[in-house]
Amino acid sequence: MVKNHDPKNEMQDMLTPLDAEEAAKTKLRLDMREIPKSSIKPEHFHLMYLLEQHSPYFIDAELTELRDSFQIHYDINDNHTPFDNIKSFTKNEKLRYLLNIKNLEEVNRTRYTFVLAPDELFFTRDGLPIAKTRGLQNVVDPLPVSEAEFLTRYKALVICAFNEKQSFDALVEGNLELHKGTPFETKVIEAATLDLLTAFLDEQYQKQEQDYSQNYAYVRKVGHTVFKWVAIGMTTLSVLLIAFLAFLYFSVMKHNERIEKGYQAFVKEDYTQVLNTYDDLDGKKLDKEALYIYAKSYIQTNKQGLEKDKKENLLNNVTPNSNKDYLLYWMELGQGHLDEAINIATYLDDNDITKLALINKLNEIKNNGDLSNDKRSEETKKYNDKLQDILDKEKQVKDEKAKSEEEKAKAKDEKLKQQEENEKKQKEQAQKDKEKRQEAERKK
């Protein structure tokens, strides 16, 4: 039996695999970024690993170095909600997610850069914003976002979340001020500062929350049997809930009691007792005051065997007004969470505390009997390279400074020598002039 030749079917068969291939390429582009090495200065190559460091403001990523480029693979998964998905949320939930975008403004205080746009923005299950693409200031794109540009893009995102007919790019490129929308959108556009915009969004969110709590209730008609089982279930749930709340209450009380005990030990300058009391507390859940108490106590006990001058310098840096991440670093270091300590130190771009964390990490690897020889060598090389990069950079800065000072001293010596020669010549000339005058006097 001979099959009839159908050009339409043949074309369809050809298009299907092509469409699937194109879809796979599109997903790859979403999950991956490639940066040519030609776009980066060679002396900055060692900084590229910062693009895979964990940060609360960015999607986790993995950096791979190829011959001519760096590839970044993003871990985009079901826990990440794309910006476009929140458009279908209820108004109060939508406002909550949008209000949290203000947190990304904190990135401008770090060395990282990012793109604030719909296709670059995701949210965690808790509604916290995370950006996909990140760069490094003066190293790799994207360029830093100014306060004015951040505010403009923030407004455009808010409007697009409520008005799907609007184009984000068109609003950002100049149509924002010309946009005529709802009273809500007008208020968003009129906000002159980030604080005013977030205050307005928070006000709207609170109104929506109040409206939902006062005007909405879910009622379901059920038969007697269903009602009975629901009642039994609710009773059981109530008992479990009371038990849980009791556990939570006593757990919180115990937690607060330990915090207070640590504070009392700190006042008595019993720094070792402070460390023992806070030993297994989660630093990320502590307030700034508790972190300060731990950080100062840890440095005072000098667990790292620091020299006196170095110790005093660190104590001067640890104050109640210090950066919370800086204080958290000392708790992570003291509790042996060295990877977290290294991440925080790198994020803060502080060479001194980064070196300290790396040295501790190398000692941990050295003393870890569970590691095979190959794994120990691999890990040692990894962290040794990071430490050496910092030392080389510091040595370069130190050498350049010494060279500059040497050149200044040399120039100063040459100038002084020239002045002495000039003074000597002036004295010799003055002596010659004097002798000529005396000779002239004798001949008269």
From Swiss-Prot:
Disordered: region residues: 366-444
Bilayer disposition of the protein: Single-pass membrane protein
Domain of life: Bacteria
Protein's UniProt keywords contain Transcription regulation: no
Residue numbers on the Extracellular membrane side: 251-444
Coiled coil spans: 387-443
Composition skew (Basic and acidic residues), residue ranges: 372-444
Gene Ontology CC terms, in alphabetical order: plasma membrane
InterPro entries on file: T7SS_EssB (IPR018778), T7SS_EssB_C (IPR042565)
Residue ranges of the TM segments: 230-250
Cytoplasmic side: 1-229
Pfam families, alphabetized: YukC
Keywords, ordered alphabetically: Cell membrane, Coiled coil, Membrane, Transmembrane, Transmembrane helix, Virulence
Keyword Transmembrane: yes
Subcellular location: Cell membrane
Function noted in UniProt: Component of the type VII secretion system (Ess). Required for the secretion of EsxA.
More info: This strain lacks esxB and esxC.
Family note: Belongs to the EssB family.
Name of this protein: Type VII secretion system protein EssB
Organism: Staphylococcus aureus (strain MRSA252)
